[in-house]
């Protein structure tokens, strides 16, 4: 779920 972390940024 790396895309999730990038989504918040």
From Swiss-Prot:
Tissue specificity of this protein = Expressed by the venom gland.
Modification Methionine amide occurs at: 9
Compartments reported by the entry: Secreted
Q: Does the keyword Repeat apply?
A: no
Record has Mitochondrion as a keyword: no
What GO MF terms are annotated? ion channel regulator activity; toxin activity
Could you list this entry's UniProt keywords, alphabetically sorted: Amidation, Ion channel impairing toxin, Secreted, Toxin
Which domain of life does this protein belong to? Answer: Eukaryota
| Chain coiled-coil ranges | none
The cellular component terms of Gene Ontology attached to this UniProt record, alphabetical and capped at eight, are: extracellular region
Its subunit composition reads:
Monomer.
Summarize the protein's role: Peptide with unknown natural function. Has neuroprotective activity since is shows potent antiseizure effects in acute (kainic acid (KA) and pentylenetetrazole (PTZ)) and chronic (temporal lobe epilepsy model induced by pilocarpine) epileptic models. Protects against the KA-induced seizures after intraperitoneal injection in a dose-dependent manner, indicating that the peptide can cross the blood-brain barrier. Is more efficient in the KA-induced than in the PKZ-induced seizures. Does not adversely affect motor and cognitive behavior.
Please identify the protein, giving its name as recorded. Occidentalin-1202
Its lineage reads: Eukaryota, Metazoa, Ecdysozoa, Arthropoda, Hexapoda
């Amino acid at each position: 779920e790396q895309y999730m972390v990038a989504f918040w940024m």
